[in-house]
Regions:
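S-adenosyl-L-methionine-dependent DNA methyltransferase catalytic core
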Residues: 44-47, 70-172
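Conserved Class I SAM-dependent methyltransferase catalytic core
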Residues: 1-68, 72-76
Length: 172
């Protein structure tokens, strides 16, 4: 095709061709170097005659009511100048139609129908009631965090999705 758009997780920019745990990575093996996946992708498109630009875009900056960062690669075979898209929406703007869309903006007019909603246990509900809009398990009282999280409390990572409540006044 004359043009293409490819999207992926932003981690593709730092992904090595050969995945090896960090502690076991051989600094002298080029395939284990960070960013080698992207290097190969760019090289292959260049061999096919494409001029490319790439970057990380966040859907919230383009009218989607969600923070969602994605790697985007745009290519052209026509030797035309191509650019990453300019954001259309902003956290603050004097014109409301150019501001980030919130969860509330998106669902405000929907009819409430809980037909088949997930049923939470009494214990889980008791934790969720303590978490403010836009918060997560870290907003629980300190003495309840370990109880609420169970075995996941000791696991690595940020765990921000656990006991998460969306904010009606923010993108999700």
């Amino acid at each position: 095709p004359r043009f293409f758009i490819m999207e992926n997780v932003k981690g593709i920019m730092s992904a090595p061709l050969k995945h090896v745990p960090l502690a076991e990575r051989d600094k002298n093996d080029p395939e284990q170097q960070l960013g080698t996946v992207l290097d190969v992708i760019l090289s292959e498109f260049q061999k096919l005659g494409y001029k490319t630009v790439y970057g990380v875009l966040d859907a919230v900056n383009y009218g989607v009511p969600q923070f969602r960062e994605r790697f985007v690669l745009i290519g052209s075979r026509d030797n035309e100048n191509i650019f990453m898209p300019i954001p259309t929406h902003f956290q603050m703007h004097q014109n409301a139609s150019y501001r980030w869309q919130t969860l509330g903006d998106t669902i405000r007019d929907l009819e409430y129908d809980c037909g088949e909603c997930a049923a939470f246990s009494k214990e889980r509900l008791s934790f969720l009631k303590l978490i403010p809009e836009g918060g997560n398990w870290r907003d629980l009282p300190t003495d309840l965090r370990r109880i609420a999280m169970g075995g996941a409390f000791e696991s690595g990572g940020g765990k921000v999705g656990f006991y998460r409540r969306l904010s009606y006044n923010q993108p999700s």
